[in-house]
Structure formats: C-alpha cells, structure tokens
From Swiss-Prot:
Pathway(s) the chain acts in: Amino-acid biosynthesis; L-proline biosynthesis; L-glutamate 5-semialdehyde from L-glutamate: step 1/2
Name this protein carries in UniProt: Glutamate 5-kinase
Gene3D superfamilies in UniProt: Acetylglutamate kinase-like
InterPro entries assigned: AceGlu_kinase-like_sf (IPR036393), Asp/Glu/Uridylate_kinase (IPR001048), G5K_ProB (IPR041739), Glu/AcGlu_kinase (IPR001057), Glu_5kinase (IPR011529), Glu_5kinase/COase_Synthase (IPR005715), Glutamate_5-kinase_CS (IPR019797)
Cellular compartment(s): Cytoplasm
Source species, domain of life: Bacteria
Pfam families: AA_kinase (PF00696)
Highest classification ranks of the organism: Bacteria, Bacillati, Bacillota, Bacilli, Bacillales
Listed GO CC annotations: cytosol
Record gene name: proB
Length: 276
C-alpha cells in the first residue's frame, strides 16, 4: 500500500494552526518557509498540490497582539479577517521565492453542500491546478456561521481538507499535525504509547482511543482527524496523519516510507490491486 503512494499525482496537504504557530502565539516562519519549499518542489516534479491551511485566527491574534483567542463570534470573525489577509501575504511571499503562484479559495459548508456551487468550486480548483497555481484553501471564518437553520461552518479544517480531497479526487490527503500519527494511548503522557502504522477501518474501539481538543489557537483534536479519515475512507481515498514540524517528511511519504499513520480502507486496496 505504501509503495503505491509514489504514484500519487494530485495531493491535498492540510496544515494545522499548531504547525504554523509556536505555542507562545508567534508565527513559525521557519516551518512555513520549509512547507513552501517542499510543495514547490513537488510542483516542479509534476505533482498537483492543494494546500488546506488553518491559522487565520491564530495569525490574526498575533497580528493584533491578542494574548488569548477571542470567544465571541464577532470578535473571532474580525480577527480571522485580519489573520487571513496576513496569512496569504506570508504564503505569497514564501511561495514566490520558489517561483510559485498561489490562489486563495475561501469556502463555507453551504457552498460545498449545494450541487451547483459545489461544481463551481470543483471547476475553479481544476482551473487553478491546470494553470500550475497552488490553491490555498481555508474556511471563510469571517462569514461562516453555525445555526440550526443555516449551517455554513465545517467545524474544523480537518473535515474541510477531506471534503476538498474528495472534490478534486485527490490521490492522497496528507494531514500535518503536532503528533507523529495515531496512537493507542496519549504519547505525551505515556512513554510506551504505540503508533498505528495503518488503519483500515474506524471502529468504536479506535474512536474510543481518540479524545481531547487541539491547541489554544486552533480547534482540531484527534477526534476531528478520525472524522476526516473516516470521510476519506468512505470516499475510497487515502489519508496520512503525521507530524508537520518538519514538512520535508512529505518527501519521505512520497517515497513510500513508513511515516505517520496511513488510513486506507481494504476496498481501496482491492480496487488498487485490480488496476495494477
């Protein structure tokens, strides 16, 4: 299964706030610069790359010198507005250093749920990729709401990245997080925690092993990553969860090395076997 990853042509890379930001709330420019280098090199190699990036609120908090993440929706959305602009400025600068053009794509759940607008998103992403542009996707946190009558929020970018991977029929979703993979117990408190190399089915037992929220500047936790993995597997797609502290790990993944946790259903493996 890992060996087949070498043939992946269309990739979705998801990077979380914990990878983009230091724990003290400052922007991790070194990691972002490395990420831009890796994705640019993949483009040079002939791969198609889509980046799903969190961080608008975290970067906004830094830009506005806020010590903690706001709690009210208007404040969060105002901070996201500032942060998204700053985040794209940083990405444009770093990707530009490697000769790449990036394009911003901000989505809300109603857009990808409604057939006509969903098709429009698919066409837009295809057009960007065909022009050699790297789409940078984020939820439109400035306008997204979560109400009973009108839900437009995805809840987190883990699910958004899985939805994008399905929309563009990506060969692989690589989720960069602050953990090396999916463990049987919490590796921060259990030194003997064992990491799963591959998971073929999200069982109640697997779900029970996940718990807790993400960083103070982000929203995701292991449960949201499992939900994204489940979405991918139901769509007959593959996802790898790994640590994003050194984005060059993506090169190792693309060489078929045993990095992180691979989520892939058995039926995906069977369909792959039939085509080879």
């Amino acid at each position: 299964m890992r060996e087949s990853l070498k043939n992946s042509k269309r990739l979705v890379i998801k990077v979380g706030t914990s990878t983009l930001m230091y724990g003290n709330g400052h922007i991790n420019l070194r990691t972002i610069e490395k990420l831009a280098m890796v994705l640019s090199d993949l483009r040079n190699e002939g791969k198609e790359v889509i980046l799903v990036s969190s961080g608008a609120i975290g970067v906004g908090c830094h830009k506005l010198q806020l010590p903690v993440r706001p709690t009210s929706i208007p404040d969060l959305q105002a901070v996201a507005s500032v942060g998204q602009s700053e985040l794209m400025h940083i990405y444009s600068k770093f990707f530009g250093e490697y000769g790449q053009v990036v394009g911003q794509v901000l989505l809300t759940r109603d857009v990808t749920d409604f057939p006509i607008s969903r098709e429009n998103v698919m066409n837009t992403l295809d057009s960007l990729l065909s022009r050699g542009i790297i789409p940078i996707v984020n939820e439109n946190d400035t306008v997204a709401v979560e109400e009973l009558e009108h839900v437009t929020k995805y809840g987190d970018n883990d699910l958004l990245s899985a939805i994008v991977a399905k929309l563009v029929q990506a060969d692989l979703l690589i989720m960069l997080s602050d953990i090396d993979g999916f463990y049987g117990s919490n590796p921060t408190t259990d030194p003997d925690a064992v990491m799963f190399s591959e998971i073929n089915q999200i069982t109640p037992e697997i779900e029970a092993l996940a718990g807790g929220r993400g960083s103070k500047f982000g929203t995701g936790g292991m449960l949201t990553k499992l939900s994204a993995a489940s979405y991918c597997m139901e769509s007959n797609q593959k996802m790898i969860l790994t640590n994003g502290k050194n984005p060059t790990v993506i090169f190792n993944i693309m060489q078929g090395e045993q990095v992180g946790t691979l989520f892939a259903s058995k039926k995906e493996e069977l369909s792959h076997d039939r085509t080879h």
